[in-house]
Amino acid sequence: MIKKILKYTKNLILLALSLAGIYLFNLFFMKPFSIDHFLGKELVLGLVDSPEAMTYIGIFDRFNWLTRHNSKLSIPEKDDQENSIKQYEQVIKTLYKYEDSSLSEVQKNTKKIAIFDAENNLKQVKEFPHHDYPLNQIGGIHLNTIEFLSDMHPIRNESEAKDFIKRVNLIKKLYTGVLADLEEQADAGIFPPEFVYDHVINQLSDFINYNYDEHPLYTQFLRKVKELNLSIEKEKLYEEQIKIAID
């Protein structure tokens, strides 16, 4: 009797795994059965592609041992434009495969909105790849990165403190990627309004000519580390590490 129960249990588990495998294969490598599932998948992939977004949401932090998102930043890469074009083209192609006759009224409207959004994004990436200003007087990457780390990155334990330092160490690589984008923008003859330069130069000067006691990455990091109630030796160690990362 026990053997039969174990056999049936084993078969049910294998069946469940097989069905799950078929569903996931269909979801990621074919046109999913449901347009809702397809759009949900795209939303999740968009979030997973941005370590900052995963930190903002917070629910992924418990899986950081797997995702490692809390120690990463979105670094501009040379092939970002090409990858975005391919992604949007694939999304549009898949959306058009869903026949309106098989969709509810809500799904039809969702399909129209999704296609409109994807086609607009594709047009922007193809025709206007350099028409945004990554450095500006309001919320450029130089300000947003500092604000994100000081305000949004959680430090609830030593692991997250170490991740903070890893992210600060990545800022130089991030700025190098942004600089490459700015050079391409300049080669295309696209420049922000002149008044932006003075604001950005002043903002960058504040980060370059700093005292540690005034730098938000230093002050916020130490404040959060002190709340962990670590030993004085560990606090001193982390203080030295964040100084090195900022330099």
Residue map of PLM features:
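N-terminal maturation segment of proteins
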Residues: 2, 6-247
